[in-house]
Amino acid sequence: MENLLRPIYQERASHPNTLAVIMIERRNKTSSLTDNFDAALLVIVKDADEPVFIKHYEFDHQTASLHVVTDSQIQEWILLGTNRRIIDWIVNGRVLFDRNEYVVELIDRLNTFPFAERKLKIGLEYGKLIRRYVEGKAFFEANQFLDAYNAVVHALHHLARIEVIDRGFHPETTVWSQVRQMEPQVYKLYSELIESHESLEKRLELLFLANDFLIHSKAEIGSAHLFEVMKEKDIWQFGELLQHHDLKHFTQDLGVMLDYLTEKGLINVCQIETKGQAVYHRGYSFKKGVDSDS
């Protein structure tokens, strides 16, 4: 396969804009890692008009895909976890070209997993966990048990990823095999939801009780990034938090996250006067003493 792709990747490698070329070969008959192509070629570049550019090839009854991706897009995928297979590609792919040890340094950073990045990723997962939990509970109370089940499964996935990240690892596409070793309690919850012979309603009822406890127990690490921002000044309006540079990735889940933390008494709320009579802006402030740094 490499010989067939050589003209493609050598032409790309000759560009000064190219940082690395990595080949990922199909491992199984069904391969989500390569979208069922026989191989995927990842070309990482400094910059481009489009952050992601993809081409498909066919030759000698074999198929391959070419992915030209900017360095900034790679960093965003790693940070936000929005393309989980990218880590597998980088760590397990075959490096065909590596300018100035770009891939070596990238893998070293993945292995080191700086604390600030872990804190941000945990915060993002925590917001998604709360979102799915609230959605699931709403479905459950409306007797929409299948939709509630779907939401709870997603919530457990976010909880699983928090456990993995908190231990200094990046969540893999097979996150449950990681969690089984790292946090058997969370793995057991997932197994009971999937395998229990109880009625779906009963399974969900028990899961919501357990989830409520676990979400609250993760509040300190899950909110650490948000609390760090909120310490910058005494009172915040929601729009101010939303526009803060360090919270730009929280936009979708920040509202539900603040509501949950307020309900649990971890954030203070105050009223800020408006021009309207008896109408107030809601102000949020960090409640001192809720984290270990205070």
Swiss-Prot record:
| Residue ranges that the Swiss-Prot or TrEMBL entry lists as coiled coil | none
Span of the signal peptide: none
Name the InterPro entries for this protein. NT_sf, NTF-like, WH-like_DNA-bd_sf, YgxA-like_substrate-bd, YgxA_HTH
> Which Gene3D superfamilies does the entry link to?
Beta Polymerase, domain 2, Nucleotidyltransferases domain 2, Winged helix-like DNA-binding domain superfamily/Winged helix DNA-binding domain
Name assigned to this protein: Uncharacterized protein YgxA
Q: Which organism is it from?
A: Bacillus subtilis (strain 168)
